[in-house]
Each structure stands twice: as C-alpha cells, then as structure tokens.
Amino acid sequence: MSFSVTLPDGSKKDFDKAVSVKELASSIATSLGKAAVGAKINGVMKPLDYIVDEDVEAAIITDKDEEGLDILRATAAFLLEAVAKRKYPELRLGMHEADEGGFFVDTDKEDQIKVTELPDLEKAMQKAIKNGEKIEYTSMKKSELEEIFKDDQFKLDLLKDEEDEVAVYKLGDFVDFGFDALLPNTGKIKNFKLLSVAGAYWLGKSSNPMLQRIFGTAFFKKAALDEDLKRRAEIKERDHRTIGRDLDLFFVDPKVGAGLPYWMPKGATIRRVVERYIVDKEVADGYEHVYTPVLMNVDAYKTSGHWAHYRDDMFPPMDMGDGEMLELRPMNCPSHIQIYKHHIRSYRELPIRIAELGMMHRYEKSGALSGLQRVREMTLNDGHTFVALDQIREEFAKVLKLIMDVYKDFDITDYYFRLSYRDPKNTDKYYANDEMWETSQSMLKAAMDDLGLDYVEAEGEAAFYGPKLDIQTKTALGNDETMSTIQLDFMLPERFGLTYVGQDGEEHRPVMIHRGIVGTMERFIAYLTEIYKGAFPTWLAPVQAEIIPVNEEAHGEYADKVRAELAKRGFRAEVDHRNEKLGYKIRESQTQKVPYTLVLGDEEMNANGVNVRRYGTEEQISKSLDDFIAEIDADVKSYSREK
C-alpha cells in the first residue's frame, strides 16, 4: 500500500500504510499533532480517529480554527444528548447542530424539559468531562441503526437520508449519528454553558410535533466563554421583545394571532412620532402622500408577477362568491401604479413621487416570527417615483440624499451599500428579460459610481422584477439588516401599460423607482428600541416628563397644572398620582427610562418651578418652569443622539 496526502500549501506526504488523522498531523509537526482536533479530508470534516488509506487532500484543523470550534461545539451537543438520555431514559432525541452561534439539541419528553433543569444537565456534563470519557468513532450499517432506533420515529426519519454505511459515535452505551467530526474524548469541553430552552417543530414544519430545543455554547478558552456570555447578556438587555414588555410598548398574543402585534399607548406614541416625522420629510422632498386599500383583486398581482413569483409569501385569496377574488396585499407598488394610471400623465409632471405608510400582509411561517422584526402584518414606509429615462440618475441621487438626511436625524452611522443583482445561474425566479436586467443593473451601478460611493455587489439578492441598492445596517444585536432600498423597475410599467405624453406628443414608457427609507414601522421601531436600549431620545420618548408630587394632597393640583402647561406646548407628560412612596416613584420613572423626572414639593410649588432629574443621572436641579420648558424644547428639537 502506498498513497499521498496533499497539504494546503501543495506539498505532499507519502505513506506506505494507513494512518489516522492524528498520526497524519503528528507526521507534519509534533506540535500540530498535539493541537489537532480534526481535519478536512477532501473538503469533508473528519475526526482524529478517521483512517486515511488513499490519495487525498487534507487540511489539519486545530483549536485556533473556526472549524475547530465547530468540532468542540458538536462534541458538547453530543455529550448533552448522552447525559440527557442517561438522566431521562424515556427521552427521544431529534436534530442537533453546531455553528458560530453555539449548539442546540432537540428533545422530546412527555414532561417537557424546563430551563430550571439545565443546571442539573450541566453538572452531569461536567462529571463526564472531568472523567475524560472516551468518544468512539466507528461505522454501522444503516439496517443496524434502524433496528436500534426502531421505536424512535425521529431517528428513523433522519436515517432516510443516510447511506448504507453510517458514521456513528459512541459514549458508553449511547450511540448517535449525523455528526461530521467530534473530539476523541470529553476532556476538552471544559468551557461550556447551557443557555436556554425553546420550542421547535420537528423538521421545521408546524404540522409536526413541537420539541424542546436546548441551546448552549462552548469555547476552548474560559476568557472567550466569559466574553460571549457577557455579550449575550447585553443582547438580552437590548432585545426589543424584552424592552417592549418591560416598557409596555407592544405585545403579541398567539391565541389571537401570531405575528400580529398590538401597539400599546406608549408604543403607539413612538410609532406615531416616527410616522409624522417621515411624512413631513417626504412631503418636503416633493412626495404626495396617499391612502390605498389593503385588499386588491388577485388579477392585479397576476399582472404584476407577484402571483407567479411571490405567491408562497402571500395569504390565500378571499373568494367573494361572485367571481371576484380579493388578496391582502404583500406589497404596495400595484396600488401606487393605480394612482399613476388614474390620470393621463405629461412629461411636465415628471418625476411623479407617490408615498404611503402602507399596511401589508405577508405569510410568514410561525417559526420565523419574532417580536416586531418578523410579523405577518406590517406598515411599510413606501414610495414610488415615476421618471423619464434621462431623470433616473438625478432622482436616484435625490432619494439617496433623503435617506442619508434621515439617518443623520436618527444617528444611524453603522451601514454600508449593497448592489443586489439577480442570480445569473438561477434566472427562473426573476422576470425573464435579459436586456432589461443588463440595462437596469448597469444604470444602478453607474448611479453609484457617479456619487463616488463604495459598495459591495451581491448576486441573487434582487427582487424578482429588478435590481436594487440595499443599505445594510448593523443592529444593536450585531445582525446585518436591510434598512433602506432603492430599486429600478422597467418591468411593472411595461406590464401595467404605464405611459406619459412626451414633448413630441407621443406616448412614452416611464421608469419606476421603488424606495423605502426606513423599511417597515415594526422593524424600524424594533431597531430603534435596541439601539437606544429603550432610553429613547426625548423627541421619541413616549413620556417625555414624569411629574411626581411629593405629597398628593399638598402638591397634586400643582402637578396637574405643570402637566397642563407642558401639554399645551406639545410635550408628553404624565403625573404619578399613585399612593406610593416618593423614592419608589422616582425609581419607577428611571426604570421606565423617562428622559425627565420632575419632583414637586413646597419649594417648587411656591416658586412656580420644578426639580429636574435627567434619566441616567443622580443630579437634581431646581429651576423655574419656564426655564425647564426652554430646556426640554431645545432637547426635543435636537433630534440626534449626537446633538
């Protein structure tokens, strides 16, 4: 026997007998053999015990590599399965996965595993880690595994996709499959944490049983684990779902409709302020705001192409019984096209800018729903401009300037530009007109080049009817998210027969520019909630000033007078008339992250003044009511956090 192993640098090592991955690593360098945790053999992850006995390409994986962390986390998931099965013999195991976020294991138990049981599972894992229990890598016939798991439908489902010979891992009597590479023993899984338990449908289908998904993470170094747990705690504090509950901004009740948020008065106030701001900005920029129905005849979506390309994301149509089929709109563009078509248009009117805070409905699977970020009913800050061909670049620059102005007011600074094209290898899901795609993509690129802006290009991210500029922001939780979009569309004007009368008296086809400045109200307010951590700047805060009388009987009437003065000038203020201790009320105001807390006692009442405490500070300053009104007025008008 003789064979060669090709290494990443192109060099080769020759062998005359079979070697394990660990032996291969040691033959390259003794230190590499000690650091190795696995290898990529012909691009596939393999464990240290894997035997190499033929010509292959090999890359050794160490604990310094990302793939090494995947191997560690997969091993932690395997160990969690083993100890959970020991602790709960009746337990059935489903999917498992390890990635850059950590690992998870799906479990099925009649008496569901609760988060309070995680410490006991951790202790069982730590005991196995301390003992350095051996993890055996071997293979078994698929038929053997089917016999072992004959009473476990979950495992039988997973075995359907396996070959006749299946790689398996054993820890004592425990056996499982579906792992690429694991460590040879439990000793290195020292720095791990079980994080949470959540529901997950088997194979991701809502018609299947709901399992309990246990999440965890693991690192080679304790410092890395500590840093990750600190980051996760920060994320939890910033999670808009948590803040929304604590500040009473919104709620979602699956019993009355998953993905359908209810806006409480405070959340509705924030949304209303944002909506008014957006409308004022757009009107000042030449847009005409409209209202259009949320229902539309299905034929409109057949004409637009949504029915063919977007139907899976739409709710089923409503049969009105007289041949009419109505559809909840998933997008606003066909509605704005009807506004354009309602009159004969002249070149003198162009560009025609139409905008709407348009309510839409999209069918999202229940497993994808999340707070305000993924919902089934949403209100989009939508706009469409109809232009002549020679107006595209100027209008594109104008829209981009409007977006940048809005970003400045909200102090959005962490973003980049992405030009999103169709996938040339998978054109079936896009409007079939190669010339249109080439023209619109080159025009979009030229418009960005004219402005001297840096951008990345992404194939496969375009809408089915045209390429677009996506402005990608980084959320407070570290996720990449599309905030704004500008899109060139030659298709819909063609499909709906849109025209304008040109200077020559002939009919011409306009180009349609789709644009969204801040996306949906739901997602944007989720973004703001997390960025501000619930401590909204004064202009956005649902309650701008909390007024607390020291003694209700003595100072309650004066507190109402102060609130009335503030309300008269357009400021949002509340009086805390509850029969609670003063210190409790002040702490509550801070907990609710109200920008200004005003405490009113004898001194303030006699001087027609207020005692002011800014959120996040201990300092209390007495001043006249007029001076405070001037202060809060300047604060509200400053908009940006930087100002």
Curated annotation (Swiss-Prot):
Zn(2+) binds at C333, H384, H514. SMART domains: tRNA_SAD. Its EC number is 6.1.1.3. Residues 239-537 are annotated as: Catalytic. It comes from the Bacteria. Keywords: Aminoacyl-tRNA synthetase, ATP-binding, Cytoplasm, Ligase, Metal-binding, Nucleotide-binding, Protein biosynthesis, RNA-binding, tRNA-binding, Zinc. One of its GO terms (biological process) is threonyl-tRNA aminoacylation. One of its GO terms (cellular component) is cytoplasm. Binds 1 zinc ion per subunit. Residues 1-62 form the TGS domain. Gene3D superfamilies: 3.10.20.30, Anticodon-binding domain, Bira Bifunctional Protein, Domain 2, Threonyl-trna Synthetase, Chain A, domain 2. GO terms for molecular function: ATP binding; catalytic activity, acting on a protein; metal ion binding; threonine-tRNA ligase activity; transferase activity; tRNA binding. Its main location: cytoplasm. It is an enzyme of class 6 (ligase). It is found in: Cytoplasm. Its cofactor is Zn(2+). It catalyses: tRNA(Thr) + L-threonine + ATP = L-threonyl-tRNA(Thr) + AMP + diphosphate + H(+). HAMAP family: Thr_tRNA_synth (MF_00184). Belongs to the class-II aminoacyl-tRNA synthetase family. Catalyzes the attachment of threonine to tRNA(Thr) in a two-step reaction: L-threonine is first activated by ATP to form Thr-AMP and then transferred to the acceptor end of tRNA(Thr). Also edits incorrectly charged L-seryl-tRNA(Thr). Homodimer. This is Threonine--tRNA ligase. It comes from Lactobacillus johnsonii (strain CNCM I-12250 / La1 / NCC 533).
